[in-house]
Amino acid sequence: MAPVSKTELEPPNGGWKAWRTVFGSFLLQTSSYGYVTACGVFTLYYKQVMLPEYSASQLGWIATIAVFLIFGVGIPIGALVDRYGTRPVVAPFVALGIVSLGLLSLCKTYWQIVLCQGVAFGLACSGTTLPAVICVTQWFSTKRGLAVGLASSGSSFGGLIFPIMVSRLINSHGFKTAIHWSTLVVGVCMIVGLICCEGPYPPKRLAAMKEKESSATPSLESPKIDEKPDESDLGVSSSIEASTHPKPAAKVLGMRHNLVPWIAFCVGVFCCTFSLLVPFDYLPIIAAEQGMKQDLAQYTLAMINAGSMIGRIIPGFVSDHLGQFNVMALVTTLSAIALLVVWLPVYYSPTNGGIIFFSLFYGFVSGGYTSLLSPCVVALVDGQVANLGLKFGIACLCLAFGALVGIPVSGAVADDTGNWGGLIGLSGAMMALGAVSFIVSRVKMGGWNPMSKV
């Protein structure tokens, strides 16, 4: 195999194909994760009309299963992308997504909805969302935060348009027609996104880069072949050699070093994702119960996603200049403040203005968290791109388990206490714990100097 030069290890960092891939990733995330984040509208409809006999925590499992599958199968999906490229992996999942939503329009029972909207569509989104992020990350270096922010804003755009579209169509034409039209939009976005997305490196070139990156691990200079080492030095040299090679745990995690920051980062991802989707799923119900008109309550989800769309772009752009972990620590801290200092008081003294302010503010700061996840992973692995699929998959596994328990546990707290205050308090506490974990990771990587770019 021909050697790979240093310049070939560096991403192209722009060009027509790169920005076309950003657009394709935007469409894929609009139609996959963006549709899933419209869960609050479906939960409100199921609770009030279709499945009133089911509790909030039971209905929360529909979105929870979808989100868990999107990120929980990240390791095999990422490995497939590393081996075969983006399009061959994404294509069958696009077909599955269209079929699963078509079947959703025929569902009548809770378990039918769980299987179609939760399991089948969630699995389909797992094969579109992660590859869409990976291929964008491979194209950019210094502009990575901006590019990923623009691409990931697609999920917020989907979360903005689908709640309005679905709620209006349900009110005017019924559930089945609403699903038919939204399936058409999802299908067109997925197919166009599939055509536009393309990785910068063919699978064979990626394999060569992977081999080159592995050989680039720092090591001591080996003795010449014809020189026999002193027997008295054998014990010392072997111990030094062992210390310069990655530990097994670091190898499994795809890390050369930075193992402690990586673990702290994974804890932060779990805790923040535990809280992330709670307002997306429950805010419309809470707002309606607090006296907000149902039409306006449904739009709170669109407001969150409108704020999130801006929040995914601006923090990503700023992180290219100030550092990914600096901005990540800031936006997760602000997300905890939004939950504990804004939403919790507004719940006990509800006003339409307070609910709207929380929706926009929380959407903005939580959007920054979502868009910075992949740039932070790249920063943790020293900018290597050949194994990004596997590394993103490991991070997504932590995200998946956070999503798996977050919405149902929060819903169970609300069911047990009979009010929503415990749900909001638990979400805020977990978000604060996640922010602390990101701060620990940032300090371990860059020290205590707040001015250093990390």
Task: State what each model feature region is.
Residues 46, 118, 125-148, 279, ...:
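Intracellular juxtamembrane helix-capping segments at the cytosolic ends
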Residues 26, 30, 97-101, 110-127, ...:
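Hydrophobic core of transmembrane alpha-helices in multi-pass small-molecule transporters
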Residues 381-420, 426-427:
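A late C-terminal transmembrane helix in Major Facilitator Superfamily
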Residues 143, 150-206:
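Helix-loop-helix hairpin linking two adjacent transmembrane segments in secondary transporters
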Residues 1-35, 196-206, 230-263:
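Cytosolic juxtamembrane N-terminal segment immediately preceding the first transmembrane helix
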Residues 95-108, 333-349:
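C-terminal ends and interior cores of transmembrane alpha-helices
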